[in-house]
């Protein structure tokens, strides 16, 4: 056995497994203690390495040298030299925690902001709206859905007020916006564009439904002229045909068609173009062959209605002034020796109360004075007033 061991070279193992006994080596543990930190890294490897147990002291010394040489080679191969670290391990381990903390704070900040916006939306009553709001701009997020809803609601309310004022004007002979003027809020609303107030421009129908001649009846001629002019006031056109005759009315219709084809006419202030009916009536007033008496007869009913509206508005203003004066007098306390102030206020109060009595009696005289006569530029001016 010793001879076989002597014949083998250093570091060579025997092929027979029966002669070997696997025992842990005690010497490497002692070497690890002597070497200190450098041998501590090789201590676990010594348990894995197996050596052959022999009785000869020389063989044991050779095996010890082989083991130490192998350990040194093993350490060089598998233990790379330590690299200098720029930062300690403890600091590098704390950085992810800080980064993670910022991310968590950002998430909770976004959640808190979203909850605040949802709370505001709940208070405003917009839970039923469609779609979602883009919150990418965070605090600068614009709730366009709420803006559209509020704009639509305001538009509907404004339309209802206009319809109500129109009904009062048509049925009660009241001007639109009279309530606003009484409350002192008439100047708060912005003037609407012309297209919203008057609608789309009315175009003249040049061909018409059928041809008209002087021999046709006045009713047929008036109906066809009103149709071609797209004029809603057919009674006014009928009076024109009745007073001027079929021939003159047809001539005015032809002149109106020519003016409309050339671009139309502007109203007096130049803010918009006249309607075909307005052009027809303007030509009627500016025709030398038509007398002033005929023009007054044609527009008598419109002028009378306009005069009554102005008179009613004047009475309403006087009545409102009388009420304010009456309330002011009730709020004042006069002394017994202040006779001058009593007489002054009494005279003013009597005039105001007299105007109140006149307003309560009902509609006044309907006779049109010569100096109050009004010439209408075109029929739609009556509705705009």
Curated annotation (Swiss-Prot):
Family: Belongs to the PHAX family.
Entry keyword annotation includes Phosphoprotein: yes
Short motif (Nuclear export signal): ranges: 120-129
The organism's taxonomic lineage, starting at the top: Eukaryota, Metazoa, Chordata, Craniata, Vertebrata
Modified residues (Phosphothreonine): 287
Subunit-level organization: Found in a U snRNA export complex with PHAX/RNUXA, NCBP1/CBP80, NCBP2/CBP20, RAN, XPO1 and m7G-capped RNA. Part of a precomplex with PHAX/RNUXA, NCBP1/CBP80, NCBP2/CBP20 and m7G-capped RNA. Interacts with NCBP1/CBP80. Found in a complex with snoRNA. Interacts with NCBP2/CBP20. Interacts with DDX39A; this interaction stimulates PHAX RNA binding activity.
Region Sufficient for poly U RNA-binding: start-end pairs: 219-319
Species: Rattus norvegicus (Rat)
Protein name: Phosphorylated adapter RNA export protein
Biased composition (Basic and acidic residues): 164-184, 364-385
A single GO cellular-component term on record: nucleus
Main location: nucleus
């Amino acid at each position: 056995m010793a001879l076989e061991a002597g014949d083998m070279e250093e570091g060579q193992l025997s092929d027979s497994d029966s002669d070997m006994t696997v025992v842990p080596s005690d010497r490497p543990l002692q070497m690890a203690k002597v070497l200190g930190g450098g041998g501590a890294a090789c201590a676990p490897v010594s348990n894995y390495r197996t050596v052959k147990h022999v009785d000869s002291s020389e063989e044991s010394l050779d095996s010890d040298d082989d083991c130490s040489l192998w350990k040194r080679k093993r350490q060089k191969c598998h233990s790379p030299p330590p690299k200098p670290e720029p930062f300690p391990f403890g600091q590098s381990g704390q950085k992810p925690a800080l980064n993670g903390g910022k991310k968590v704070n950002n998430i909770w900040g976004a959640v808190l902001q979203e909850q605040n916006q949802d709370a505001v939306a709940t208070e405003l009553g917009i839970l039923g709206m469609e779609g979602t709001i883009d919150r990418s701009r965070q605090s600068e997020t614009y709730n366009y859905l709420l803006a559209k809803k509020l704009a639509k609601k305001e538009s509907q309310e404004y339309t209802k007020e206009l319809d109500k004022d129109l009904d009062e004007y048509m049925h009660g002979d009241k001007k639109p916006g009279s309530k606003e003027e009484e409350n002192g809020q008439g100047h708060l609303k912005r003037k609407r564009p012309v297209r919203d107030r008057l609608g789309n421009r009315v175009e003249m129908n040049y061909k018409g439904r059928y041809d008209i001649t002087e021999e046709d009846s006045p009713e047929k001629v008036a109906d066809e002229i009103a149709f071609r002019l797209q004029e809603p006031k057919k009674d006014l056109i009928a009076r024109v045909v009745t007073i001027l005759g079929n021939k003159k009315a047809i001539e005015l219709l032809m002149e109106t068609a020519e003016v409309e084809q050339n671009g139309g006419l502007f109203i007096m202030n130049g803010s918009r173009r006249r309607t075909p009916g307005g052009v027809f009536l303007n030509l009627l007033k500016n025709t030398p062959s038509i007398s002033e008496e005929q023009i007054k007869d044609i527009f008598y009913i419109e002028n009378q209605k306009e005069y009554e509206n102005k008179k009613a508005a004047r009475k309403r203003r006087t009545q409102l002034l009388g009420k304010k004066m009456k309330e002011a007098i009730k709020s004042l306390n006069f002394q017994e020796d202040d006779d001058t102030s009593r007489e002054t206020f009494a005279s003013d109060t009597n005039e105001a109360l007299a105007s109140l009595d006149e307003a309560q009696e009902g509609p006044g005289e309907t006779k049109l004075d010569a100096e109050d006569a009004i010439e209408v530029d075109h029929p739609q001016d009556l509705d705009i007033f």
